[in-house]
Amino acid sequence: MKLNEVKEFVKELRGLSQEELAKRENELKKELFELRFQAAAGQLEQTARLKEVKKQIARIKTVQSEVK
């Protein structure tokens, strides 16, 4: 993700409720699990997607802690 894309993503996250943030986090965690499984099986082609999903989860957690 480029810097502008990251800023837009975080801006979008800040507009969501806690429930929506939790839902988005769970979806990304499921995707991360699937990506790790593919990587272990040697089927993952976009290895950078692992890092990107981890960072998105961290951004969601950051926004969640800002609200608290």
From Swiss-Prot:
Q: Which GO terms describe its biological process?
A: translation
Q: Which cysteines are joined by disulfide bonds?
A: none
Question: What keywords does the record list, in alphabetical order?
Answer: Ribonucleoprotein, Ribosomal protein
Q: Which InterPro entries match?
A: Ribosomal_protein_uL29, Ribosomal_uL29, Ribosomal_uL29_CS, Ribosomal_uL29_sf
- Cellular component GO terms held in the UniProt record: cytosolic large ribosomal subunit
The record, for Pfam families, names: Ribosomal_L29
Aminoacyl-tRNA synthetase recorded as keyword: no
Could you confirm whether the keyword Heme appears in this record?
A: no
Q: Name one GO molecular function term.
A: structural constituent of ribosome
NCBIfam families attached to this UniProt entry: L29
UniProt lists the family membership as follows: Belongs to the universal ribosomal protein uL29 family.
Please identify the protein, giving its name as recorded.
Large ribosomal subunit protein uL29
The beginning of the lineage is: Bacteria, Bacillati, Bacillota, Bacilli, Lactobacillales
Q: Which gene encodes it?
A: rpmC
